[in-house]
């Protein structure tokens, strides 16, 4: 059994590639059902910075290829698109990666806590799809707990802790616009809500929300005391705005170049566009329009680098905490790796004992019921004594995979027996 994770990240994969691999929330249930055809357990984490598929598989190399094939088939892309930047982790490396991720150590914005909500959401969707089993349940809940501990005991989560807060920091280059300008938030999800909070905290009060689902726009607007307009008013709302934050889950372009050209015509002040969606909401051609300044997720990287440098010492402290939590998980994992073999070993011994007892009792029909019970009890005791030391050795967290392989070979236990035992309740 192996834990495998494949993925691409903002650090080494441009948004032009990430947006072709991304899954929106509505696609995830069906995608997870498809993933279960390849693996025993699985989860998909798709955010503006990363697309990752994590799974528990029975065969290491075959599992890697299955996950790559899954991405190719689900996204309709050639593997050559993502192969150069794809990372592949196994077992302990997966656990370390997910624990660091939940602590914000692997984020574009070091220490950001938005990833916690994204992991919880991905976990809930995977649970609902029946894709989460005992291993990923333990890994992901352990990651969330480790991330919380790292944030609680270090200063990694101080200051700018989300892509949204970094975007607001970029807006401060235009203080008059932020204080006196009109802002438009396109979308009504988690990132849209974060955007509202940060815009209001930054001094911007003239804010309008536009969203395809009017009920969600209305609810969000009432919660924060801002205005909202229906989706049909999007272009008019754009023309009336100075700052635009677009963060929908739309599969394609929301603001076309032509729409932005019309909105920018005759303006005397800059039009700031922040595209925080993946796939991107805003046509990249708008960057060529005079007076229009487009920032997508990747364009915010320079500010994030400064953020990481300032928090380097706190990040080291957080890494130490994460390593301790990873070690705890790996002790549990080592034992779990041995459990199917132990069950199969005991079943093998019991099958042999049962066959020999039946043969022996058939030869001794004169034995009384009490004597028969004594013989059966004796055989059980012998089996338990013989298996005790091997089982203790297999349960040792320090036991290697070579020991498991050796035991299977010595007792002629095939993989089918091992995985049948693994699925026993």
From Swiss-Prot:
<feature type="binding site">
    <location>
        <position position="118"/>
    </location>
    <ligand>
        <name>substrate</name>
    </ligand>
</feature>
<dbReference type="InterPro" id="IPR036291">
    <property type="entry name" value="NAD(P)-bd_dom_sf"/>
</dbReference>
<keyword id="KW-0149">Chlorophyll biosynthesis</keyword>
<keyword id="KW-0560">Oxidoreductase</keyword>
<dbReference type="InterPro" id="IPR000343">
    <property type="entry name" value="4pyrrol_synth_GluRdtase"/>
</dbReference>
<feature type="binding site">
    <location>
        <position position="107"/>
    </location>
    <ligand>
        <name>substrate</name>
    </ligand>
</feature>
<dbReference type="InterPro" id="IPR006151">
    <property type="entry name" value="Shikm_DH/Glu-tRNA_Rdtase"/>
</dbReference>
<keyword id="KW-0521">NADP</keyword>
<dbReference type="InterPro" id="IPR036453">
    <property type="entry name" value="GluRdtase_dimer_dom_sf"/>
</dbReference>
<comment type="pathway">
    <text>Porphyrin-containing compound metabolism; chlorophyll biosynthesis.</text>
</comment>
<dbReference type="GO" id="GO:0008883">
    <property type="term" value="F:glutamyl-tRNA reductase activity"/>
</dbReference>
<dbReference type="InterPro" id="IPR018214">
    <property type="entry name" value="GluRdtase_CS"/>
</dbReference>
<feature type="site" description="Important for activity">
    <location>
        <position position="97"/>
    </location>
</feature>
<dbReference type="GO" id="GO:0019353">
    <property type="term" value="P:protoporphyrinogen IX biosynthetic process from glutamate"/>
</dbReference>
<comment type="similarity">
    <text>Belongs to the glutamyl-tRNA reductase family.</text>
</comment>
<dbReference type="Pfam" id="PF00745">
    <property type="entry name" value="GlutR_dimer"/>
</dbReference>
<protein>
    <recommendedName>
        <fullName>Glutamyl-tRNA reductase</fullName>
        <ecNumber>1.2.1.70</ecNumber>
    </recommendedName>
</protein>
<dbReference type="InterPro" id="IPR015896">
    <property type="entry name" value="4pyrrol_synth_GluRdtase_dimer"/>
</dbReference>
<comment type="subunit">
    <text>Homodimer.</text>
</comment>
<feature type="binding site">
    <location>
        <begin position="112"/>
        <end position="114"/>
    </location>
    <ligand>
        <name>substrate</name>
    </ligand>
</feature>
<keyword id="KW-0627">Porphyrin biosynthesis</keyword>
<dbReference type="GO" id="GO:0015995">
    <property type="term" value="P:chlorophyll biosynthetic process"/>
</dbReference>
<dbReference type="InterPro" id="IPR015895">
    <property type="entry name" value="4pyrrol_synth_GluRdtase_N"/>
</dbReference>
<dbReference type="GO" id="GO:0050661">
    <property type="term" value="F:NADP binding"/>
</dbReference>
<dbReference type="Pfam" id="PF05201">
    <property type="entry name" value="GlutR_N"/>
</dbReference>
<feature type="active site" description="Nucleophile">
    <location>
        <position position="48"/>
    </location>
</feature>
<dbReference type="Pfam" id="PF01488">
    <property type="entry name" value="Shikimate_DH"/>
</dbReference>
<dbReference type="InterPro" id="IPR036343">
    <property type="entry name" value="GluRdtase_N_sf"/>
</dbReference>
<comment type="function">
    <text>Catalyzes the NADPH-dependent reduction of glutamyl-tRNA(Glu) to glutamate 1-semialdehyde (GSA).</text>
</comment>
<feature type="binding site">
    <location>
        <begin position="187"/>
        <end position="192"/>
    </location>
    <ligand>
        <name>NADP(+)</name>
    </ligand>
</feature>
<comment type="pathway">
    <text>Porphyrin-containing compound metabolism; protoporphyrin-IX biosynthesis; 5-aminolevulinate from L-glutamyl-tRNA(Glu): step 1/2.</text>
</comment>
<feature type="binding site">
    <location>
        <begin position="47"/>
        <end position="50"/>
    </location>
    <ligand>
        <name>substrate</name>
    </ligand>
</feature>
């Amino acid at each position: 059994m192996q834990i495998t994770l494949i993925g691409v990240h903002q650090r080494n994969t441009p948004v032009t590639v990430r947006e072709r691999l991304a899954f929106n929330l509505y696609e995830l249930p069906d995608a997870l059902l498809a993933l279960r055809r390849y693996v025993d357990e699985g989860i998909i984490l798709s955010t503006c910075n990363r697309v990752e598929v994590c799974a528990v598989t029975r065969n290491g190399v075959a599992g890697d290829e299955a996950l790559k094939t899954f991405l190719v088939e689900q996204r309709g892309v050639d593997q050559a698109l993502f192969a150069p930047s794809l990372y592949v982790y196994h077992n302990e490396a997966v656990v370390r990666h997910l624990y660091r991720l939940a602590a914000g150590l692997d984020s574009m914005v070091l220490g950001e806590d938005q990833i916690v909500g994204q992991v919880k959401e991905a976990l809930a969707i995977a649970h609902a799809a029946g894709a989460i089993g005992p291993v990923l349940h333990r890994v992901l809940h352990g990651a969330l707990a480790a991330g919380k501990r790292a944030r609680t005991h270090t200063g990694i989560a101080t200051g700018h802790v989300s892509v949204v807060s970094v975007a607001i920091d970029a807006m401060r280059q235009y203080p008059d616009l932020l204080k006196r300008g009109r802002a438009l938030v396109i979308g009504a999800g988690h990132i849209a809500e974060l955007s509202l909070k940060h815009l209001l905290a930054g001094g911007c009060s003239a804010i309008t929300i536009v969203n395809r689902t009017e009920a969600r726009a209305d609810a969000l607007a009432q919660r924060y005391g801002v205005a909202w307009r229906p989706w049909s008013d999007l272009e008019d709302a754009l023309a009336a705005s100075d700052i635009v934050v677009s963060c929908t889950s739309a599969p394609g372009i929301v603001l076309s170049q032509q729409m932005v050209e019309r909105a920018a015509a005759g303006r005397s002040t800059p039009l700031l566009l922040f595209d925080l969606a993946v796939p991107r909401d805003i046509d990249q051609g708008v960057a060529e329009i005079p007076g229009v300044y487009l920032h997508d997720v990747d364009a915010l990287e320079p500010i994030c680098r400064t953020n990481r440098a300032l928090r380097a010492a706190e990040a080291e402290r957080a890494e130490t905490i994460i390593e301790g939590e990873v070690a705890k998980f790996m002790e549990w994992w080592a034992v779990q790796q041995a459990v199917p073999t132990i069950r199969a070993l005991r079943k093998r011994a019991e099958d042999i004992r049962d066959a020999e007892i039946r043969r022996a009792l058939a030869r001794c029909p004169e034995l009384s019921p009490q004597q028969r019970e004594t013989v059966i009890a004796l055989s059980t005791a012998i089996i338990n004594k013989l298996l005790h030391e091997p089982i203790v050795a297999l349960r040792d967290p320090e036991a290697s995979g070579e020991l498991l392989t050796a035991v299977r070979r010595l007792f002629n236990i095939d993989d089918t027996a091992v995985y049948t035992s693994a699925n026993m309740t």
